[in-house]
Design a protein with these regions (language model features):
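Soluble or luminal CAZymes and related metallo-dependent hydrolases
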Residues: 123, 127, 250-258, 314, ...
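P-loop NTPase switch/coupling surface
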Residues: 1-225, 443, 468, 472-487
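Phosphate/oxyanion-binding loops and surfaces in catalytic or ligand/nucleic-acid-binding neighborhoods
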Residues: 46-50, 151-155, 265-272, 385, ...
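Extended helical coiled-coil dimerization/tether regions that scaffold
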Residues: 181-313, 317-334
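Switch/communication elements of ASCE P-loop NTPase nucleotide-binding domains
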Residues: 1-63, 287-432
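Hydrophobic, Leu/Ile/Phe/Ala-enriched alpha-helical segments that form helix-helix packing faces
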Residues: 47, 96-98, 127-136, 255-273, ...
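Acidic, Mg2+-coordinating catalytic modules of nucleic-acid enzymes
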Residues: 22, 137-140, 394, 408-487
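Short linear motifs in intrinsically disordered
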Residues: 74-89, 273-287, 383-393, 435
Length: 487
């Protein structure tokens, strides 16, 4: 599933806004106050139509048994506020188009700003019916939907008893893969508890499995095939081996899927590998608060997930969250769907900013990503020249610039390999540090040549603030300044 277009009317920051999206990566950039957060929340709200439980739409719902799933309606503060008239809009609308199982979906979430008003279900009924028909067909995949706020994963959601009971089940309800999918807080502790539970159940099985395998091997080495068939002890050993295998298989498959996804993700992050954070294996560590996920790395070190550096912890947590949702929804099948990451560059070293988006795209190749960023490293390392392989002449990735007062974003040209300073200057409306320094130098020399001592000192102080008092460039500036001083 992916979302192709959105058309917003009277929602929060926007009087009107519309945008078209690419199937792989959509990077949102722009200064604060341009509406990036509003657009992100509009996308999330639009996608929630699949969780309708309105009885007028039928009897079969994805939300069945999970009261956290529903269509996201509009709150009073969601209606656009006109600062000139000091009035809220009388209605709000988010229209969207998308594709699920090659079916074109068109829907609208519309609500009037009156007491007790509700969403007009008729405006998303056809899309919902089409979606559910595909979703409920035999062997169908369900799309991943996930949102990661700029506070993720540092604000945890509480795990109450009912949720704990669910994650401790051997077989989890399929729609639990959508649990708190759009929440500001993190489900990391939830998946961590689940993963540790699986690991803890596996660990006691290794010793008897190894013992049985050894006994089977000894008999097979010493007896003929005919003797083995007549050997009652051998038959019992084979039965026990099958029992242990069947018990361990679902546990192993689940743990291995998450482990392999995180391993794959790290393989696309050279800096993480260079620092020795290649995963060797997971294990569960007992603490006063219960089991905690410990990661053993190939360099011999180990760390609790929660004790990793902030940037690594966020990336690992997002990768684990996506992987777990995918596994619960579709087992080991590569899932499609939509993932939204606010401030993808948060807490990251520049070397990681350059590759983080591509790492997510390579690890989860069927997903459509929406990410916001202020990092020039992110946008200048995304190849937006690639086109779809399905024959359609459509770009897979794009960078969208949002500006104040505009009703749609600007699509940037391919910036892959473009000089960072040029990107800052020409496309992010931000002067590079080098350019800013040059402008200050020129002004400083001009004031010196006019013998404006106070003004020149003020500019020099700004240079100090920009480069630091120990910067080598200061010596060059001081030497050149002598040529401009009035004697």
């Amino acid at each position: 599933m992916n979302i192709e277009t959105i058309n917003i009317t009277n929602y929060r920051y926007f009087k009107h806004y519309e945008a078209s999206f690419c199937p792989k990566a959509n990077v949102l950039i722009g200064r604060n106050g341009t509406g990036k957060t509003t657009l992100i929340h509009a996308i999330i709200k639009a996608l929630s139509f699949i969780f309708s439980n309105d009885k007028s739409l039928g009897k079969d719902f994805l939300s069945a048994g999970n009261n956290t799933l529903n269509v996201k309606s509009y709150n009073t503060s969601d209606f656009h506020f006109n600062q000139e008239t000091r009035e809220y809009s009388s209605e709000a609308s988010i229209k969207a188009t998308g594709i699920f199982y090659e079916q074109q979906l068109n829907w609208e979430l519309f609500k009037r700003n009156t007491p007790k008003s509700a969403l007009y279900t008729s405006l998303y009924k056809d899309a919902f019916t089409s979606f559910m028909t595909s979703a409920k067909s035999e062997n169908s995949e369900w799309p991943i939907l996930a949102y990661y706020s700029d506070s993720y994963p540092h604000v945890y959601s509480r795990i109450n008893k009912s949720v704990l009971d669910v994650i401790n089940q051997d077989i989890i309800p399929r729609n639990f893969g959508y649990y708190q999918w759009d929440d500001e807080s993190a489900c990391t502790s939830l998946w961590e508890a689940r993963l540790c539970n699986r690991i803890a159940k596996m660990q006691p099985l290794y010793t008897p499995a190894a013992r049985v395998a050894s006994a089977i091997y000894e008999k097979e080495e010493s007896l003929t095939q005919k003797e083995l068939q007549a050997d009652a002890d051998y038959q019992k050993l084979k039965e026990e081996d099958n029992r242990l295998t069947e018990t361990m298989k679902p546990l192993y498959n689940e743990v291995n899927y998450i482990e392999q996804k995180l391993t794959s993700f790290i393989s696309h992050l050279p800096k993480v590998q260079a620092e020795g954070f290649d995963i060797d294996y997971f294990f569960a560590t007992q603490s006063e608060e219960g089991y905690k996920l410990t990661i053993n790395f190939k360099n011999g070190s180990s760390s609790l997930l929660q004790d990793l550096p902030a940037g690594y912890r966020r990336l690992f947590s997002i990768a684990i969250d996506i992987a777990y949702r995918s596994y619960i929804l579709n087992q080991s099948v590569e899932s499609s769907g939509v993932v939204v990451i606010d401030e993808i560059d948060l807490h990251l070293h520049p070397a990681l900013e350059q590759v983080v988006l591509n790492a997510f795209m390579e690890t989860f190749p069927q997903l459509q990503f929406f990410v916001s960023t202020h990092s020039v490293s992110v946008i200048s390392n995304l190849d937006t020249s690639k086109t779809s392989t399905d024959g359609a002449d459509k770009r897979e990735n794009q960078i969208l610039v949002m500006n104040i007062g505009e009703e749609q974003p600007q699509v940037l040209p391919n910036l892959l390999g473009v000089d960072y300073n040029a990107v800052l200057r020409d496309f992010m409306d931000t002067p590079s540090r080098n350019e800013e320094l040059k402008n200050l130098e020129d002004l400083y020399y001009s004031y010196l040549s006019m013998d404006l001592k106070n003004e020149s000192q003020t500019i020099y102080n700004q240079i100090l603030a920009l480069v630091g008092k120990d910067a080598k460039v200061l010596e060059t500036i001081q030497n050149k300044a002598k040529e401009y001083e009035v004697h």
